[in-house]
Amino acid sequence: MQNKLAIWSTENKERKFDRLLRLVADRTWLIEAARITLASSGAKTPGVDGVDKRKMEENLHHELATIRTELLTGLYNPLPARRVYIPKANGKMRPLGIPCLRDRIVQRAMLMVMEPIWESDFHPVSYGFRPARSVHHAIRTVKLQLQDSGRGSKGRWVIEGDLASYFDTVHHRLFMKAVRKRIADQRLLDLLWKLIKAGCIDRGLFRASSEGVPQGGVISPLLSNIMLHEFDTWMEANYLNEKKRSVRWGWNESVRQQWPIAVREQRQWKPAISYCRYADDFVLVVKGTKADAEVMREACRGFLEDQLKLTLNMDKTRITHVNDGFVFLGHRIIRKRGPRGRMRPVSMIPWEKYRRFAEKLVKQLSGDYSKNRMDMMEHLNRQLGGWAAFYQYTDHTATMFSKLDRTVFWKFGYWLARKYRCGFRSLMRDYIDAPEAGQAKTWVLEGQNSRGWYGAIALRRLITSRKGHFTWRTPSENPYILREEIRHTIESRYADVAFAMSNT
Protein backbone atom coordinates (compact mmCIF):
# COMPACT_ATOMS: atom_id res chain seq x y z
CA MET A 1 0.00 0.00 0.00
CA GLN A 2 2.88 2.36 0.70
CA ASN A 3 4.09 1.71 -2.85
CA LYS A 4 0.68 2.73 -4.23
CA LEU A 5 0.57 5.89 -2.11
CA ALA A 6 4.04 6.86 -3.34
CA ILE A 7 3.13 6.22 -7.00
CA TRP A 8 -0.13 8.17 -6.79
CA SER A 9 1.63 11.05 -5.08
CA THR A 10 4.41 11.11 -7.67
CA GLU A 11 2.08 10.93 -10.68
CA ASN A 12 -0.14 13.77 -9.47
CA LYS A 13 1.54 16.50 -7.44
CA GLU A 14 -1.81 18.22 -6.83
CA ARG A 15 -3.67 15.16 -5.55
CA LYS A 16 -5.25 15.36 -2.10
CA PHE A 17 -5.65 12.04 -0.33
CA ASP A 18 -8.86 11.10 1.45
CA ARG A 19 -9.97 8.16 3.67
CA LEU A 20 -6.50 7.77 5.13
CA LEU A 21 -7.69 7.28 8.70
CA ARG A 22 -9.23 3.96 7.69
CA LEU A 23 -5.75 2.87 6.68
CA VAL A 24 -4.20 4.13 9.93
CA ALA A 25 -6.82 2.18 11.91
CA ASP A 26 -6.47 -1.00 9.86
CA ARG A 27 -5.72 -4.05 12.04
CA THR A 28 -2.74 -5.19 9.97
CA TRP A 29 -1.41 -1.64 9.83
CA LEU A 30 -1.61 -1.22 13.61
CA ILE A 31 0.00 -4.62 14.23
CA GLU A 32 2.96 -3.66 12.03
CA ALA A 33 3.21 -0.25 13.73
CA ALA A 34 3.21 -1.96 17.13
CA ARG A 35 5.88 -4.44 16.02
CA ILE A 36 8.21 -1.64 14.91
CA THR A 37 7.53 0.43 18.03
CA LEU A 38 8.09 -2.39 20.51
CA ALA A 39 11.24 -3.56 18.71
CA SER A 40 12.95 -0.20 19.27
CA SER A 41 15.24 0.38 22.24
CA GLY A 42 13.06 3.26 23.45
CA ALA A 43 10.10 0.93 24.08
CA LYS A 44 11.45 0.25 27.56
CA THR A 45 10.95 3.92 28.49
CA PRO A 46 7.38 4.60 29.70
CA GLY A 47 5.34 7.74 29.14
CA VAL A 48 3.10 9.56 31.58
CA ASP A 49 0.86 6.48 31.96
CA GLY A 50 3.77 4.36 33.24
CA VAL A 51 3.22 1.59 30.65
CA ASP A 52 6.46 0.12 29.35
CA LYS A 53 7.22 -2.59 26.78
CA ARG A 54 6.55 -5.51 29.14
CA LYS A 55 3.14 -4.24 30.25
CA MET A 56 2.11 -3.40 26.68
CA GLU A 57 3.05 -6.85 25.36
CA GLU A 58 1.00 -8.56 28.09
CA ASN A 59 -2.24 -7.10 26.71
CA LEU A 60 -1.24 -6.03 23.21
CA HIS A 61 -4.18 -7.42 21.18
CA HIS A 62 -6.78 -5.88 23.47
CA GLU A 63 -4.92 -2.55 23.46
CA LEU A 64 -4.72 -2.48 19.65
CA ALA A 65 -8.44 -3.27 19.39
CA THR A 66 -9.21 -0.39 21.77
CA ILE A 67 -6.99 1.99 19.80
CA ARG A 68 -8.68 0.97 16.54
CA THR A 69 -12.16 1.55 17.94
CA GLU A 70 -11.22 4.95 19.36
CA LEU A 71 -9.63 6.02 16.06
CA LEU A 72 -12.66 5.07 13.97
CA THR A 73 -15.13 6.69 16.37
CA GLY A 74 -13.09 9.87 16.82
CA LEU A 75 -12.69 9.29 20.56
CA TYR A 76 -8.93 8.82 20.51
CA ASN A 77 -7.12 11.52 22.50
CA PRO A 78 -3.31 11.50 22.78
CA LEU A 79 -1.92 11.84 26.29
CA PRO A 80 0.56 14.61 27.13
CA ALA A 81 4.19 13.69 26.58
CA ARG A 82 6.55 13.26 29.52
CA ARG A 83 9.15 16.01 29.19
CA VAL A 84 12.78 15.21 29.98
CA TYR A 85 15.93 17.25 29.45
CA ILE A 86 19.14 15.97 27.88
CA PRO A 87 22.43 17.89 27.82
CA LYS A 88 23.58 19.55 24.60
CA ALA A 89 27.17 19.94 23.44
CA ASN A 90 27.20 23.61 24.46
CA GLY A 91 26.20 22.82 28.04
CA LYS A 92 22.53 23.78 27.66
CA MET A 93 19.63 21.36 28.03
CA ARG A 94 17.46 20.13 25.16
CA PRO A 95 13.79 19.36 26.01
CA LEU A 96 12.38 16.08 24.70
CA GLY A 97 8.84 14.79 24.97
CA ILE A 98 8.39 11.05 25.55
CA PRO A 99 4.91 9.94 24.41
CA CYS A 100 3.23 6.94 25.97
CA LEU A 101 3.52 3.66 24.05
CA ARG A 102 -0.03 3.67 22.66
CA ASP A 103 0.55 7.16 21.24
CA ARG A 104 3.85 6.01 19.74
CA ILE A 105 2.04 3.16 17.99
CA VAL A 106 -0.53 5.57 16.54
CA GLN A 107 2.22 7.99 15.48
CA ARG A 108 4.06 5.14 13.74
CA ALA A 109 0.87 4.16 11.88
CA MET A 110 0.38 7.79 10.80
CA LEU A 111 4.01 7.99 9.69
CA MET A 112 3.61 4.84 7.59
CA VAL A 113 0.74 6.56 5.75
CA MET A 114 2.04 10.12 5.44
CA GLU A 115 5.72 9.62 4.65
CA PRO A 116 5.28 7.87 1.25
CA ILE A 117 3.09 10.78 0.15
CA TRP A 118 5.44 13.58 1.13
CA GLU A 119 8.58 11.81 -0.04
CA SER A 120 7.39 12.57 -3.57
CA ASP A 121 7.19 16.28 -2.74
CA PHE A 122 10.26 16.95 -0.61
CA HIS A 123 13.11 18.79 -2.28
CA PRO A 124 16.09 16.73 -3.55
CA VAL A 125 18.57 18.70 -1.42
CA SER A 126 16.63 18.15 1.82
CA TYR A 127 18.34 15.32 3.72
CA GLY A 128 17.32 15.49 7.36
CA PHE A 129 15.46 12.51 8.90
CA ARG A 130 14.38 11.04 5.58
CA PRO A 131 14.62 7.40 4.47
CA ALA A 132 17.68 6.45 2.38
CA ARG A 133 19.37 9.77 3.25
CA SER A 134 21.96 10.73 5.83
CA VAL A 135 24.40 13.38 7.02
CA HIS A 136 26.91 12.04 4.51
CA HIS A 137 24.54 12.80 1.62
CA ALA A 138 24.30 16.42 2.75
CA ILE A 139 28.07 16.82 3.24
CA ARG A 140 28.78 15.29 -0.16
CA THR A 141 26.25 17.59 -1.83
CA VAL A 142 27.75 20.73 -0.27
CA LYS A 143 31.26 19.66 -1.31
CA LEU A 144 30.11 19.16 -4.90
CA GLN A 145 28.41 22.56 -4.87
CA LEU A 146 31.71 24.13 -3.78
CA GLN A 147 33.79 22.59 -6.57
CA ASP A 148 36.10 25.05 -8.33
CA SER A 149 34.51 26.01 -11.66
CA GLY A 150 37.83 26.87 -13.25
CA ARG A 151 39.03 30.05 -14.93
CA GLY A 152 37.45 33.25 -13.70
CA SER A 153 35.88 31.58 -10.69
CA LYS A 154 34.76 34.12 -8.13
CA GLY A 155 34.99 33.64 -4.40
CA ARG A 156 32.05 31.92 -2.79
CA TRP A 157 30.37 33.01 0.40
CA VAL A 158 28.55 30.56 2.64
CA ILE A 159 25.49 31.43 4.73
CA GLU A 160 25.13 29.09 7.72
CA GLY A 161 21.42 29.13 8.46
CA ASP A 162 20.33 28.83 12.10
CA LEU A 163 16.67 28.86 13.13
CA ALA A 164 16.02 29.98 16.70
CA SER A 165 14.19 27.23 18.67
CA TYR A 166 12.60 25.86 15.51
CA PHE A 167 10.74 22.87 16.96
CA ASP A 168 9.23 25.02 19.71
CA THR A 169 8.04 27.85 17.43
CA VAL A 170 6.21 26.11 14.56
CA HIS A 171 2.96 27.96 13.92
CA HIS A 172 0.12 25.43 14.21
CA ARG A 173 -2.30 27.09 11.77
CA LEU A 174 0.35 27.52 9.09
CA PHE A 175 1.49 23.95 9.64
CA MET A 176 -2.03 22.57 9.16
CA LYS A 177 -2.37 24.71 6.04
CA ALA A 178 0.72 23.00 4.62
CA VAL A 179 -0.65 19.56 5.52
CA ARG A 180 -3.98 20.26 3.80
CA LYS A 181 -2.16 20.60 0.48
CA ARG A 182 -1.93 16.81 0.44
CA ILE A 183 -4.53 15.50 2.91
CA ALA A 184 -8.28 15.94 2.49
CA ASP A 185 -9.30 13.43 5.16
CA GLN A 186 -10.78 15.61 7.89
CA ARG A 187 -10.66 12.81 10.46
CA LEU A 188 -6.91 12.39 9.99
CA LEU A 189 -6.47 16.16 10.14
CA ASP A 190 -8.41 16.24 13.42
CA LEU A 191 -6.17 13.48 14.82
CA LEU A 192 -3.06 15.39 13.78
CA TRP A 193 -4.42 18.55 15.40
CA LYS A 194 -5.00 16.66 18.66
CA LEU A 195 -1.45 15.33 18.48
CA ILE A 196 0.25 18.72 18.19
CA LYS A 197 -2.06 20.18 20.85
CA ALA A 198 -1.53 17.37 23.40
CA GLY A 199 0.99 19.34 25.46
CA CYS A 200 3.42 17.81 27.96
CA ILE A 201 3.98 17.10 31.65
CA ASP A 202 7.02 19.09 32.78
CA ARG A 203 8.23 18.48 36.35
CA GLY A 204 4.76 17.35 37.37
CA LEU A 205 2.94 20.30 35.79
CA PHE A 206 0.88 20.27 32.60
CA ARG A 207 2.03 22.60 29.82
CA ALA A 208 -0.38 23.39 27.02
CA SER A 209 0.99 23.53 23.47
CA SER A 210 0.15 26.77 21.68
CA GLU A 211 2.92 26.41 19.08
CA GLY A 212 5.69 24.02 18.10
CA VAL A 213 5.81 20.34 17.19
CA PRO A 214 6.58 17.72 19.85
CA GLN A 215 10.22 16.63 19.97
CA GLY A 216 10.76 12.96 20.73
CA GLY A 217 7.87 11.39 18.84
CA VAL A 218 8.49 9.18 15.81
CA ILE A 219 6.42 11.47 13.60
CA SER A 220 8.12 14.70 14.74
CA PRO A 221 10.86 14.71 12.03
CA LEU A 222 8.26 14.35 9.27
CA LEU A 223 6.15 17.18 10.70
CA SER A 224 9.18 19.47 10.87
CA ASN A 225 10.12 18.65 7.27
CA ILE A 226 6.57 19.37 6.07
CA MET A 227 6.79 22.87 7.53
CA LEU A 228 10.27 23.63 6.18
CA HIS A 229 9.29 22.22 2.79
CA GLU A 230 7.56 25.57 2.32
CA PHE A 231 10.97 27.23 2.61
CA ASP A 232 12.43 24.72 0.13
CA THR A 233 9.62 25.51 -2.30
CA TRP A 234 10.26 29.25 -1.99
CA MET A 235 13.98 28.74 -2.61
CA GLU A 236 13.23 26.60 -5.67
CA ALA A 237 10.77 29.09 -7.15
CA ASN A 238 12.95 32.16 -6.64
CA TYR A 239 16.55 30.97 -6.90
CA LEU A 240 17.05 27.33 -7.86
CA ASN A 241 14.86 26.37 -10.83
CA GLU A 242 16.21 26.44 -14.39
CA LYS A 243 14.49 29.69 -15.35
CA LYS A 244 15.90 31.56 -12.36
CA ARG A 245 19.36 30.04 -12.82
CA SER A 246 19.46 31.22 -16.44
CA VAL A 247 19.13 34.81 -15.20
CA ARG A 248 21.95 34.29 -12.70
CA TRP A 249 24.49 33.96 -15.49
CA GLY A 250 27.63 35.28 -13.80
CA TRP A 251 29.21 31.95 -12.95
CA ASN A 252 32.27 32.50 -15.10
CA GLU A 253 33.68 35.97 -15.72
CA SER A 254 35.34 34.97 -18.98
CA VAL A 255 32.04 33.64 -20.35
CA ARG A 256 30.12 36.72 -19.22
CA GLN A 257 32.50 39.03 -21.04
CA GLN A 258 31.79 37.28 -24.33
CA TRP A 259 28.16 38.37 -24.33
CA PRO A 260 27.27 41.37 -26.54
CA ILE A 261 27.57 44.69 -24.78
CA ALA A 262 23.90 45.48 -25.37
CA VAL A 263 22.84 42.25 -23.67
CA ARG A 264 25.20 42.83 -20.76
CA GLU A 265 23.84 46.32 -20.21
CA GLN A 266 20.19 45.24 -20.30
CA ARG A 267 20.52 42.26 -18.00
CA GLN A 268 21.28 42.78 -14.36
CA TRP A 269 23.92 40.41 -13.04
CA LYS A 270 22.77 38.31 -10.09
CA PRO A 271 24.81 35.88 -8.03
CA ALA A 272 24.19 32.16 -8.44
CA ILE A 273 22.78 30.35 -5.40
CA SER A 274 23.23 26.79 -4.12
CA TYR A 275 21.20 25.33 -1.27
CA CYS A 276 21.30 22.31 1.03
CA ARG A 277 19.15 21.60 4.10
CA TYR A 278 19.31 19.01 6.87
CA ALA A 279 16.27 19.38 9.16
CA ASP A 280 16.48 22.93 10.60
CA ASP A 281 20.12 23.44 9.55
CA PHE A 282 20.76 24.77 6.06
CA VAL A 283 23.61 26.14 4.00
CA LEU A 284 23.44 28.67 1.17
CA VAL A 285 26.39 29.07 -1.19
CA VAL A 286 26.46 32.47 -2.89
CA LYS A 287 28.80 32.98 -5.81
CA GLY A 288 29.31 36.70 -5.68
CA THR A 289 30.31 39.37 -3.19
CA LYS A 290 29.74 39.43 0.54
CA ALA A 291 27.13 42.13 -0.04
CA ASP A 292 25.24 39.70 -2.27
CA ALA A 293 25.32 37.14 0.54
CA GLU A 294 23.98 39.70 3.01
CA VAL A 295 21.10 40.51 0.65
CA MET A 296 20.34 36.80 0.34
CA ARG A 297 20.39 36.33 4.11
CA GLU A 298 17.96 39.21 4.55
CA ALA A 299 15.63 37.73 1.91
CA CYS A 300 15.59 34.41 3.77
CA ARG A 301 14.93 36.16 7.06
CA GLY A 302 12.02 38.07 5.55
CA PHE A 303 10.34 34.99 4.11
CA LEU A 304 10.77 32.89 7.26
CA GLU A 305 9.41 35.60 9.53
CA ASP A 306 6.62 36.91 7.30
CA GLN A 307 5.33 33.69 5.74
CA LEU A 308 6.23 30.93 8.22
CA LYS A 309 6.43 32.90 11.51
CA LEU A 310 9.89 31.44 12.17
CA THR A 311 12.89 33.37 13.46
CA LEU A 312 16.27 33.31 11.76
CA ASN A 313 18.93 33.85 14.41
CA MET A 314 20.93 36.63 12.75
CA ASP A 315 23.75 36.38 15.30
CA LYS A 316 24.38 32.70 14.52
CA THR A 317 23.52 32.87 10.82
CA ARG A 318 27.07 33.74 9.84
CA ILE A 319 28.45 34.65 6.42
CA THR A 320 31.81 32.98 5.86
CA HIS A 321 34.14 32.72 2.89
CA VAL A 322 34.62 29.12 1.86
CA ASN A 323 38.42 29.50 2.04
CA ASP A 324 38.04 30.28 5.76
CA GLY A 325 35.95 27.17 6.34
CA PHE A 326 32.66 26.57 8.14
CA VAL A 327 31.11 23.81 10.27
CA PHE A 328 28.04 21.97 8.98
CA LEU A 329 26.56 18.85 10.60
CA GLY A 330 29.65 18.16 12.67
CA HIS A 331 32.07 18.50 9.73
CA ARG A 332 34.41 21.36 8.97
CA ILE A 333 34.22 22.13 5.25
CA ILE A 334 36.94 24.27 3.72
CA ARG A 335 38.39 24.80 0.26
CA LYS A 336 42.08 23.97 -0.06
CA ARG A 337 44.55 23.71 -2.89
CA GLY A 338 44.84 20.18 -4.19
CA PRO A 339 47.92 18.33 -5.50
CA ARG A 340 47.34 19.62 -9.05
CA GLY A 341 47.07 23.23 -7.98
CA ARG A 342 43.28 23.55 -8.19
CA MET A 343 41.16 24.55 -5.23
CA ARG A 344 38.94 21.74 -3.98
CA PRO A 345 36.58 21.45 -0.99
CA VAL A 346 37.50 19.01 1.77
CA SER A 347 35.70 17.98 4.94
CA MET A 348 37.61 17.55 8.18
CA ILE A 349 36.91 16.76 11.81
CA PRO A 350 36.41 20.02 13.73
CA TRP A 351 38.93 20.42 16.53
CA GLU A 352 36.16 21.18 19.02
CA LYS A 353 34.40 17.90 18.17
CA TYR A 354 37.63 15.96 18.66
CA ARG A 355 38.41 17.70 21.95
CA ARG A 356 34.98 17.03 23.45
CA PHE A 357 35.00 13.38 22.42
CA ALA A 358 38.52 12.84 23.79
CA GLU A 359 37.60 14.54 27.08
CA LYS A 360 34.52 12.34 27.35
CA LEU A 361 36.59 9.15 26.99
CA VAL A 362 39.27 10.38 29.39
CA LYS A 363 36.60 11.18 31.98
CA GLN A 364 35.18 7.66 31.70
CA LEU A 365 38.67 6.20 32.24
CA SER A 366 39.40 8.43 35.24
CA GLY A 367 37.17 6.62 37.71
CA ASP A 368 34.75 3.73 38.27
CA TYR A 369 37.55 1.25 38.86
CA SER A 370 35.09 -1.36 40.13
CA LYS A 371 33.53 -1.74 36.68
CA ASN A 372 34.03 -5.02 34.85
CA ARG A 373 37.04 -4.63 32.56
CA MET A 374 35.33 -6.44 29.66
CA ASP A 375 32.31 -4.15 29.97
CA MET A 376 34.59 -1.11 29.95
CA MET A 377 36.38 -2.25 26.79
CA GLU A 378 33.09 -3.06 25.03
CA HIS A 379 31.77 0.37 25.98
CA LEU A 380 34.89 2.08 24.62
CA ASN A 381 34.81 0.07 21.39
CA ARG A 382 31.17 0.99 20.75
CA GLN A 383 31.91 4.69 21.13
CA LEU A 384 35.08 4.54 19.04
CA GLY A 385 33.29 2.53 16.35
CA GLY A 386 30.42 5.00 16.13
CA TRP A 387 32.79 7.96 15.93
CA ALA A 388 34.86 6.27 13.22
CA ALA A 389 31.74 5.41 11.20
CA PHE A 390 30.48 9.00 11.37
CA TYR A 391 33.78 10.37 10.06
CA GLN A 392 34.71 7.50 7.74
CA TYR A 393 34.27 9.66 4.60
CA THR A 394 36.05 12.69 6.05
CA ASP A 395 39.37 13.89 4.59
CA HIS A 396 42.63 14.17 6.54
CA THR A 397 41.56 12.03 9.52
CA ALA A 398 44.87 10.19 10.09
CA THR A 399 46.32 12.79 12.48
CA MET A 400 43.29 12.99 14.76
CA PHE A 401 42.62 9.25 14.63
CA SER A 402 46.19 8.41 15.65
CA LYS A 403 46.16 11.09 18.36
CA LEU A 404 42.94 9.70 19.83
CA ASP A 405 44.31 6.15 19.58
CA ARG A 406 47.31 7.12 21.71
CA THR A 407 45.14 8.90 24.27
CA VAL A 408 42.75 5.97 24.73
CA PHE A 409 45.58 3.38 24.66
CA TRP A 410 47.56 4.95 27.50
CA LYS A 411 44.54 6.05 29.51
CA PHE A 412 43.03 2.55 29.40
CA GLY A 413 46.36 1.10 30.55
CA TYR A 414 46.46 3.45 33.54
CA TRP A 415 42.84 2.54 34.31
CA LEU A 416 43.81 -1.15 34.43
CA ALA A 417 46.83 -0.35 36.61
CA ARG A 418 44.67 1.53 39.12
CA LYS A 419 42.02 -1.18 39.04
CA TYR A 420 44.43 -4.04 39.79
CA ARG A 421 47.03 -1.93 41.66
CA CYS A 422 49.93 -3.31 39.68
CA GLY A 423 52.74 -1.95 37.54
CA PHE A 424 52.14 -0.64 34.04
CA ARG A 425 55.03 -2.63 32.56
CA SER A 426 53.66 -5.95 33.82
CA LEU A 427 50.25 -5.14 32.36
CA MET A 428 51.77 -4.36 28.98
CA ARG A 429 53.69 -7.62 29.06
CA ASP A 430 50.56 -9.65 29.84
CA TYR A 431 47.87 -7.89 27.81
CA ILE A 432 49.51 -6.18 24.80
CA ASP A 433 49.26 -8.29 21.67
CA ALA A 434 48.20 -8.24 18.01
CA PRO A 435 44.52 -9.26 17.63
CA GLU A 436 45.36 -10.93 14.32
CA ALA A 437 48.47 -11.54 12.28
CA GLY A 438 49.67 -8.36 10.60
CA GLN A 439 47.65 -6.01 12.82
CA ALA A 440 49.06 -3.41 15.18
CA LYS A 441 49.42 -4.39 18.80
CA THR A 442 46.86 -3.16 21.30
CA TRP A 443 45.20 -4.15 24.56
CA VAL A 444 43.71 -7.66 24.29
CA LEU A 445 41.70 -8.89 27.27
CA GLU A 446 40.12 -12.26 27.90
CA GLY A 447 37.42 -12.80 30.46
CA GLN A 448 33.71 -12.71 31.26
CA ASN A 449 31.49 -9.65 31.07
CA SER A 450 28.56 -8.82 33.32
CA ARG A 451 26.13 -10.58 30.95
CA GLY A 452 27.92 -13.91 31.26
CA TRP A 453 29.67 -13.91 27.87
CA TYR A 454 33.24 -15.23 27.92
CA GLY A 455 35.85 -14.48 25.27
CA ALA A 456 38.66 -12.20 24.12
CA ILE A 457 38.27 -8.55 23.09
CA ALA A 458 40.79 -6.16 21.57
CA LEU A 459 40.72 -2.39 22.07
CA ARG A 460 39.69 -0.75 18.80
CA ARG A 461 42.29 1.24 16.85
CA LEU A 462 40.80 4.12 14.86
CA ILE A 463 43.79 4.36 12.54
CA THR A 464 42.82 0.97 11.07
CA SER A 465 39.16 1.94 10.52
CA ARG A 466 37.67 1.60 7.07
CA LYS A 467 37.90 4.66 4.86
CA GLY A 468 36.08 5.17 1.61
CA HIS A 469 34.61 7.53 -0.95
CA PHE A 470 30.95 8.19 -0.29
CA THR A 471 28.50 7.58 -3.13
CA TRP A 472 24.72 7.32 -3.27
CA ARG A 473 22.15 5.73 -5.51
CA THR A 474 19.28 7.78 -6.95
CA PRO A 475 18.52 9.76 -3.77
CA SER A 476 16.07 11.97 -5.66
CA GLU A 477 13.59 9.11 -6.11
CA ASN A 478 10.84 8.18 -3.66
CA PRO A 479 12.25 5.21 -1.69
CA TYR A 480 8.76 3.74 -1.25
CA ILE A 481 8.39 3.10 -4.99
CA LEU A 482 9.56 -0.42 -5.71
CA ARG A 483 12.17 -0.59 -8.45
CA GLU A 484 14.61 -3.09 -9.81
CA GLU A 485 18.18 -2.58 -8.61
CA ILE A 486 19.89 -0.06 -10.89
CA ARG A 487 23.38 -0.99 -11.94
CA HIS A 488 25.91 1.65 -10.87
CA THR A 489 27.49 2.40 -14.24
CA ILE A 490 29.68 5.28 -15.36
CA GLU A 491 26.55 7.03 -16.68
CA SER A 492 24.79 6.75 -13.32
CA ARG A 493 27.86 8.19 -11.59
CA TYR A 494 27.64 11.24 -13.82
CA ALA A 495 23.94 11.44 -12.97
CA ASP A 496 24.79 11.46 -9.25
CA VAL A 497 27.20 14.37 -9.69
CA ALA A 498 24.77 16.24 -11.92
CA PHE A 499 22.03 15.82 -9.29
CA ALA A 500 24.18 17.22 -6.50
CA MET A 501 25.36 20.13 -8.63
CA SER A 502 21.97 20.85 -10.20
CA ASN A 503 21.57 23.93 -8.00
CA THR A 504 25.05 25.35 -8.58
Tell me the role of every PLM-derived stretch.
Residues 55-77:
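Amphipathic alpha-helical blocks
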Residues 71, 80, 124-130, 137-312, ...:
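Conserved polymerase palm-domain catalytic core
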Residues 376-423, 427-431:
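Non-catalytic, peripheral interaction segments enriched in hydrophobic/basic residues
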Residues 25-32, 80-81, 89, 196, ...:
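Core structural elements
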